[in-house]
Structure formats: structure tokens, C-alpha cells
Amino acid sequence: MANSERTFIAIKPDGVQRGLIGEIIKRFEQKGFRLVAMKFMRASEDLLKEHYIDLKDRPFFAGLVKYMHSGPVVAMVWEGLNVVKTGRVMLGETNPADSKPGTIRGDFCIQVGRNIIHGSDSVESAEKEIALWFHPEELVNYKSCAQNWIYE
């Protein structure tokens, strides 16, 4: 598929605890994106500090790392045409109060500190985040039989 890209999506501890893993995966699959990697894990503080390094000078940084380390997360890599941009639209705004109904955050979240999901904000960020969370051999390349029904 031409112009295919990959994005990093992580279901945060609140999304895991609330039993939303299946619903989130379902939405990405139903859209037509292809899951190429997934881990259910408790992220180390070092991994989280590196992941959120751009926010290290913000007053909420320590609390964010502590919260993300408080329970398991589901780290995923999704692939498809415009998956970074479309994935961000599917997630909704960072602040759930600004998210439209029909988005993941608009349907399932109330407060910004418990917004259940992370998604890469650019192709460059996605590449960096995927390399941080996954080894190359953990990314599975395959052709989905549905691909011909999703793309021209």
C-alpha cells in the first residue's frame, strides 16, 4: 500500500483499569488500520522519562511519569494510510472536555489527567516512539486479507 505509515498508540493505566482495551483496538481495526505490534506491560520509569522527555520542564512531568508507572499499559503500533493524523482525530483532544462525541476521549474521558490513551502527534514522533518501545523484530509485517477491501 502506497504512503502507508505507522503510529504509536498506548492505552494508559486508567484505560486498562476501566476495561477499554478491546473497545480501543476495535475502533482502530474497524477503521481499517492494521495492528503490527502490541505489548501489555508495566513501563519502567526510565522508559517513561525518555518517552515524555519533551515535557521534562513542565510542572506536571513527575506526576505524569508516576501515573504512567502506576499500572500496566498497552503499547501498540498501528499501520495504514494517514494513520498518524487519523489516529489523532480518533483519539480526540488531549483535554477530554474539548473532545467531540464519537472520539475515544469524547466518549470515555472527563479529565485531562485521566485521558486513557496516547497517540503519536507526527510521523517523526511515531518513528521515535516506536523505536523506544519496540525492537525491530517485534514489528510484524503481513498482508491483511481485508486490505483489498479498504484501499483502492
Swiss-Prot record:
It comes from Bos taurus. It holds the Pfam family NDK. It comes from the Eukaryota. InterPro entries: NDK-like_dom (IPR034907), NDK-like_dom_sf (IPR036850), Nucleoside_diP_kinase (IPR001564), Nucleoside_diP_kinase_AS (IPR023005). Autophosphorylation at His-118 increases serine/threonine protein kinase activity of the enzyme. Interaction with the SET complex inhibits exonuclease activity. Its cofactor is Mg(2+). Homohexamer. This is Nucleoside diphosphate kinase A 1. ATP binds at residues 12, 60, 88, 94, 105, 115. The keyword ATP-binding applies. Keywords: ATP-binding, Cell membrane, Cytoplasm, Differentiation, Endocytosis, Kinase, Magnesium, Membrane, Metal-binding, Neurogenesis, Nucleotide metabolism, Nucleotide-binding, Nucleus, Transferase. GO terms for molecular function: ATP binding; metal ion binding; nucleoside diphosphate kinase activity.
